[in-house]
Amino acid sequence: MRALIQRVKHASVSVDGHDVGAIEHGVLAYIGLGHDDNLQSAQRMVDKILTYRIFENDDDPAKYGKLDKNVQQVDGGLLLVSQFTLMAKTDKGRRPDFGGAMAPDAAQDLFAQLIAYAKTQHVDVATGQFGADMQVLSVNDGPLNFLLEVP
């Protein structure tokens, strides 16, 4: 499983011109699911995203400006967007190979479980719409982007 996370000032997802999810400051996370992923790897990924320290600590003078706080500690939102293209192999040729991505039906079920778990761990969770043609708007803060992986 892979997640591309971005620290954002705000982000939203719309489908067919209708907003389906939005957050103010926090983390926009694109989630890619692979063949071997399961509920345990989904839970590990959510835990990693929620505890990954990508926000400055402006409270402690000794840590001023250091990336020392996570999204929960700054009361930020979490916007989860499914993104099978993160599982692409790009090492050969000039066309991505999506063979490493989980089949759509299984991925939809696992992504729903990932969302459900995230909502038990964090107050402010929004999502895109699985399998839809989504328009994602965000204002990156930094910008700070990280590619996270869990087995």
Swiss-Prot record:
EC code: 3.1.1.96
Organism superkingdom: Bacteria
One of the record's GO molecular function terms: Gly-tRNA(Ala) deacylase activity
Alphabetic keyword roster: Cytoplasm, Hydrolase, RNA-binding, tRNA-binding
GO terms, biological process: D-amino acid catabolic process
Any single Gene Ontology cellular-component annotation: cytoplasm
Keyword hit for Magnesium: no
Span(s) of short sequence motif Gly-cisPro motif, important for rejection of L-amino acids: 142-143
Major site of localization recorded for this protein: cytoplasm
Substrates-to-products reaction catalysed: glycyl-tRNA(Ala) + H2O = tRNA(Ala) + glycine + H(+); a D-aminoacyl-tRNA + H2O = a tRNA + a D-alpha-amino acid + H(+)
InterPro entries associated with the record: Daa-tRNA_deacyls_DTD, DTD-like_sf
A Pfam family this chain is assigned to: Tyr_Deacylase
Cellular location(s): Cytoplasm
Record family assignment: Belongs to the DTD family.
Job of this protein: An aminoacyl-tRNA editing enzyme that deacylates mischarged D-aminoacyl-tRNAs. Also deacylates mischarged glycyl-tRNA(Ala), protecting cells against glycine mischarging by AlaRS. Acts via tRNA-based rather than protein-based catalysis; rejects L-amino acids rather than detecting D-amino acids in the active site. By recycling D-aminoacyl-tRNA to D-amino acids and free tRNA molecules, this enzyme counteracts the toxicity associated with the formation of D-aminoacyl-tRNA entities in vivo and helps enforce protein L-homochirality.
Subunit structure: Homodimer.
PANTHER family, sorted: D-AMINOACYL-TRNA DEACYLASE 1 (PTHR10472:SF5), D-TYROSYL-TRNA TYR DEACYLASE (PTHR10472)
NCBIfam families: D-aminoacyl-tRNA deacylase
Official protein name in the record: D-aminoacyl-tRNA deacylase
Source organism (scientific name): Psychrobacter arcticus (strain DSM 17307 / VKM B-2377 / 273-4)
